[in-house]
Each structure stands twice: as C-alpha cells, then as structure tokens.
C-alpha cells in the first residue's frame, strides 16, 4: 500500500489576521468596518474627555472674545462643552499641523473639528459593521438601516449644517447646555418649529416612545399562565427560557377591545416592523429638514397673515413665535453684530422730509 503525504502549507500571517477579523466566533465581532471604527472612535472619545476637562477658551466667533467650555476653566457638567471651531477657520480642514502652534490650534477650537470628523467616520463604520455581521450570519440588513437614522441626524448637525452655513462655528457644541443653545439659535434663525419635516420627527420620536411603552406593557401583561391562581405568575418561568412566555392573540384581543379591532396587530412581524419603521422614518425626515435648513430653506412663515377690515394685524401664534425668534436672535452672538440678521436686512427708512 502506498500512502501519499502532502505538506499542509502554513497559513500566512495576513490570512490568519483576515480570518480573525471576519470571524463570527469572537466575543465581539470586529469586521473590516471595525478596523476603521475602533481607532476613530477611540480618538474621538479620548480627545473629547481631555478637551472637556482641560481645553482653554475658544474664539468661536472669530472676534477675539474666547468662550470657556472646559471644567478646569470654570464650567460644570451641565454648562461644559467642546466649543466649536472658530469662525475665523470657517470650513477649512484644520489639523494640528496646520496651526503655527498647539496653543493656536486650541485657541481656534481645533479639538472640535477633530472630534466631530473622527466621530462621524466612527459611527458610519459602526453602521457598516452592523451590516457586515448581519451578512455573515445570514440575517437581513434592517438593523443597519434602522441605525442609519441617528447617523443621518448626527451628520446633519455636525457636518451638513456647518457646510450650509459656511463655518464649523455654526455646528452643535458638544455639551448639554451647548446642545440647548444650538436648538434655541436654530429656532431663531430657521423657525424649525414651523417646518413640516421637524413635525414628522417629533411624531416619530414621541410616537415611537408611546408605541414602545404600549408594546412592552402588553407583552409583559399577557403572560401564558403556568401556575395556579394561588401562586405568583412569575413562578412559572425561568430567565432565558426557549418557550414563549406571552400570547400575542391575547394581547391583540385586549388592545382591540381597548380601542377598536383594527388598531392592534395580530402578526408579530408586522408589529415589529411598524415599531422600527415609525421612529426611523421620523428621524430621517428630521435629518433631511436640518440639511435643507442648513441652506436656509426655512420653516413656514405665517407672520402677520391675519388682518382686519382696516388692515390692522391680528396677531396669531405665528406672530408670537416670530417675536420670540427675534428676541433669541438679539441675544445670540450679541457682540458679533448689533442687530438680528432679520432686522439688519431691512432697508433703512428714508430721512428726507
């Protein structure tokens, strides 16, 4: 008998690396998107923490009036923020090596641009990693599609809006009070409350919260009883068991009687598709609204739209909101310009008698 022995070629280091990166047996899946995601998110997180604690004041408006945002410069967790890159930089790419010194880079708000660009790249890679893992496990791609909603929203406020406005200084500050300041200024300049895409986003977020609470409470309440009436229903179950613990037919019947028959789902897949699609579509529309308002396609303007027979204005809520917008705009960047942009754009009255 003749035996043929073949030498098995040892796998190259690159081959072993590829297999490890794409293995679904790892405790945490890395994937090719993860190769880019890990360093970008680590960079963004590290710089954010350091800057939030110790970054010096930033000349956000480009008028030599620095604004303090870090903890060591007098802020607390609520008031602290990473101050956006200076208006003097505009939309220029501003890495450390473009500045004359690190002090200049910090003064002009370089950390903000570094954090935002690394963060956006990182979350986009996280979305790609979700798709990649789903693909390798033979799943459908809808997890990544759902995650695209917050990715689109973050991209809108951190990248698209600054591009439309012409400067990273108009981006959203990275902090609690900074976020609220961004929202107030956005309302003052773009009347976002009167934009239909924002209204769809509000319906998506609040509606999604309501539907999630309704679904969770229904599932928790419609248990398949495995015990007698003298025992707790909880005694009939163990954590992580394979058998179903609730009856969707019972939940459907309860909800149908609570509202009306066709207000409830009797199909689990249809129900969960609805729960995913409602907030995702709403947030997509909000991101689209921010992206259009970035280029000054603003919310509806119904100011002074109701007048009496004498031509006198009868104020509506639109006029009240407009008055509030002007007040907020007066307070915004109060040292950068003397008048709100809406007032400054009006032609001056003639002084010739």
UniProtKB/Swiss-Prot annotation:
GO biological process: photosynthetic electron transport in photosystem II; response to herbicide
Any further remark recorded for this protein: 2 of the reaction center chlorophylls (ChlD1 and ChlD2) are entirely coordinated by water. Herbicides such as atrazine, BNT, diuron or ioxynil bind in the Q(B) binding site and block subsequent electron transfer.
GO cellular component: chloroplast thylakoid membrane; photosystem II
N-acetylthreonine carried by residues: 2
CDD domains assigned: Photosystem-II_D1 (cd09289)
Protein's organism: Buxus microphylla (Littleleaf boxwood)
Top-level taxon of origin: Eukaryota
Site positions per UniProt: Cleavage: 344-345
Protein name: Photosystem II protein D1
Residues that bind chlorophyll a PD1: 198
